[in-house]
Each structure stands twice: as structure tokens, then as C-alpha cells.
Amino acid sequence: MTQRKIIHVDCDCFYAAIEMRDDPSLAGKPLAVGGSADRRGVIATCNYEARAYGVRSAMSSGHALKLCPDLTIVKPRMDAYREASKEIHTIFSDYTDLIEPLSLDEAYLDVSDSAHFGGSATRIAQDIRRRVSNQLHITVSAGVAPNKFLAKIASDWRKPNGLFVITPDQVEEFVSGLPVSKLHGVGKVTADKLGKLGINDCLQLREWDKLALVREFGSFGERLWSLARGIDERLVHNDSRRQSISVENTYDVDLPDLRSCLDKLPELLETLKTRMARIDSSYRPGKPFVKVKFHDFTQTTLEQAGAGRDLGSYQLMLTQAFNRGGKPVRLLGVGVRLEDLRGGFEQMELFER
């Protein structure tokens, strides 16, 4: 089997970068893109000057201004971001047809069969970065590796404006030093559970056989076993289409009642809005839904056609879903089904209520 060559390209603070490009007076100052604080807006992204103050994506604009009083917050211009994204994807298509967009600002490319630069994935990534910089006047970071899991980690390794390469013969050593929190699909709760088992990095994870991991983590144990060895067989799908977009949170301490669940909704919905703003224009938001997993691992999902995507609608759905079990809750999720427009264009105003 031919060794795969995967590139993960991730634009550096994409929305903010476009704003600074189009208005140079914003460069070098703390900048965020998002909704206004007086309308309970949320930060979609921010530049590195703002991040130095602790400002982060999905944070409320009000809290961001408390951390950084000099922060400039501009409204999202989705048309401009989508146009820039199209230009970047046009560049990608010069090297391969196997492109899997993850959002407006990141994508996987499979260049295993590309003849450009003698088939060198590293040189292709270098050229993509050069062309994006020259044509769009923004920077992107890229990771090159034998699979998607490692390519995504690599693209983050030297951010911003960096390139990191993991060759096949470097995989075993590179992965052995990774903290388990870096593994695809490992969130805080799973990382904490691994830590309690004495597993903090992939070298320690490799000491566990597959069956033992399955006993502890169910089917995800098999995935952990593979990732600890740098194995990821997922293909780059250029025709993959999202069915939904959602946000879930597993709580360290079970939520004891409906009131405590409802209190968690606003934060989940703010994060959902941020994620929805990153999907491309070929989707239209459809039915909202909620997911509840109870302390005994039973779960229920409720979606409602015709319901709004406002806080009140989600509160009503969550109440109905909770009442199906009426038990302490370990996981809450909120989401939206997506309608595939296949290239349709619709402006989504997701940051202002």
C-alpha cells in the first residue's frame, strides 16, 4: 500500500486576519470578531494580541472586554470570509482533488498521488502557504503527516504561520511523547479518567492492551489503542457532507436536577453559535435538537421541526428530554440538523440575537 501523504491547512485567526488585512489600522491591536457585549454577543475568534490577555473563542464579549478593556470587537462579515475561503480552496485544487473542508478556515488535503514537486508533500505545503500569503495577504499554518490525526496535530505545532512535518519513520517517537489530551476525541473527562489510571502520555497508553482499554472505555478503547500507535485509517473525503452540528459537554459532577441542566444551556448555545458560523454556505440550519445522557448511561435525543434556535426553544426541548428519565445528568448536548443546499448561498447572522 502506498504511503499516504496528508496535509492539514489551518488559517491563523482567520476572521480576525481578514479584518486586519482589510483595515490595516486594526493590526497590532487586540481585536476580536463577534457580537456586541450589550447584546450578549460571543467571540468567534480573536487575534494573538487579544489572546495574550486571555481572550478566547466562544467567550462572551462582555467577559472578553473585562479581560482586555482596549479590545476592539467588530461584527462578522461572513461574505468576506466565504469569499476568502473560496480563493484558498481554489489554490488547494491546483494540487489535488481530494480536499475535505472542515470549516471555512481549515481543510485536509490528500496529496499522495500528486505529481507536483516530485510528489513532495512538504514542498506542496510550502507552496500553498506562499501562495495564500501572496494572494490573500493572510497566513496559514500547515501540518504534513501520514494520516489525518497527525496532520492536524502538526498544523498546530508551529502556529502561527508555521509548517511542521511528521515523516513515517518519525511517527512512533513523536506519538510516544504526546499527552493523551492531544488525541482525537479525548476531552477533559476522558483525559482525567486516563490520568487516574496512570496514563498521561501515549507511551504509557501503549502499555495497555486493546481488550483492557475496551473494558474501560467501550468501543472508544479500540480507537485509543490505535491512536497511541499513530494509526488513523480515516480517508480524506471530498464529498463528505455534514448532517448536523452540535456541542456536548460531559460534567465531572452529575447535574442533579432540571434546574441545574437549564443553567448550563446559555454557555452551550454560545459555543454552538460560534461553531455554526464556521460552516460553509452550502448548508442551511434546520431542526434544533438536544441530547441528554443520564448518570446510568441511558440517553435520549429530542428534536423539533419548526422550533426556533433561541434559548427559550432549547429550554423547552431540554425540559421534555429530561423528563423522559428524570435522573441526574452526566452529559448535555445541543445542536442543529443541517440542510444541504449544495452550493446555495445564505447569510447566517449567528452572533446577534
Swiss-Prot record:
Magnesium among keywords: yes
SUPFAM superfamilies tied to this protein: DNA/RNA polymerases, Lesion bypass DNA polymerase (Y-family), little finger domain
Q: Which reaction does it catalyse?
A: DNA(n) + a 2'-deoxyribonucleoside 5'-triphosphate = DNA(n+1) + diphosphate
Q: Does the keyword Glycoprotein apply?
A: no
Q: Where do transmembrane segments lie in this chain? A: none
Q: Which UniProt keywords apply?
A: Cytoplasm, DNA damage, DNA repair, DNA replication, DNA-binding, DNA-directed DNA polymerase, Magnesium, Metal-binding, Mutator protein, Nucleotidyltransferase, Transferase
> Which residues of this protein are annotated with the site description Substrate discrimination?
Y15
UmuC domain boundaries: 6-187
GO terms of biological process kind: DNA-templated DNA replication; error-prone translesion synthesis; SOS response
Enzyme Commission code(s) on record: 2.7.7.7
One GO cellular component from the entry?
A: cytosol
Its needed co-factors are:
Mg(2+)
Provide the protein's localization. Cytoplasm
Residue sites binding Mg(2+) per the record = D10, D105
Catalytic residue positions: E106
Pfam entry (one) = IMS_HHH_1
- State any single GO MF term: DNA-directed DNA polymerase activity
Output the InterPro entries linked to this UniProt entry: DNA/RNA_pol_sf, DNA_pol_Y-fam_lit_finger_sf, DNA_pol_Y-fam_little_finger, DNA_polymerase-Y, DNApol_IV, IMS_HHH_1, Rev_trsase/Diguanyl_cyclase, UmuC
User: In terms of one coarse class, where is the protein primarily found?
Assistant: cytoplasm
Q: Of which family is this protein a member?
A: Belongs to the DNA polymerase type-Y family.
Subunit notes for this chain?
Monomer.
Summarize the protein's role. Answer: Poorly processive, error-prone DNA polymerase involved in untargeted mutagenesis. Copies undamaged DNA at stalled replication forks, which arise in vivo from mismatched or misaligned primer ends. These misaligned primers can be extended by PolIV. Exhibits no 3'-5' exonuclease (proofreading) activity. May be involved in translesional synthesis, in conjunction with the beta clamp from PolIII.
| Protein name per its UniProtKB record | DNA polymerase IV
Q: Which organism is it from?
A: Pseudomonas fluorescens (strain Pf0-1)
